[in-house]
Amino acid sequence: FTNNRFSIVLACRQSGKSISSVAYLLWFAIFHPEKTVAILANKGATAGEMLARITLMLEHLPFFLQPGCRALNKRSIEFSNNSRIISAATSGDSIRGLSINLLYLDEFAFVERAAEFYTSTYPVISSGKDTKVIITSTANGIGNIFHKIWEGAVQGVNEYKPFRVDWWDVPGRDEKWKDETISNTSQLQFDQEFGNTF
């Protein structure tokens, strides 16, 4: 994520995409003063859960790495270096009026009215020449804005850098795991949840 302004990640379920992303967000906020990081998810509770993961990571950092916290609540963390991390549900006004340096959109293929949200959010992104965007999601059919951005990234027609995490990239997942998962669900469900199939 560090070398790319726009990153999009297509990843299978339970592959660590969210936890890896929020670890990067914490690093960014700690080591880049006076930055605002926004975590937006399809539900406010999900965004809050990611902020809770960041709080837990923060508590487990070695003492010499722990930044001072000026404020810590269920929706935001403010650090002594004047950086902050905020969390909210994806809605048209969730970050309106804010200056965002890093925007993280989690499970973006599952956001209702995502195209409308993205349209209303893009001015915040484009207002800063260095604003970073990280989008992660499991596939959720074709035609949605996540699918369109992903396909554009793969084809090289937009500025997003595509990253993909397949089921076999996850430690402990092998052909036996795949066969067992399909027998307990279905091929269609496997393809949707783990196969990165649109």
Predicted regions and their residues:
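Phosphate/NTP-binding elements of NTP-utilizing enzymes
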Residues: 1-198
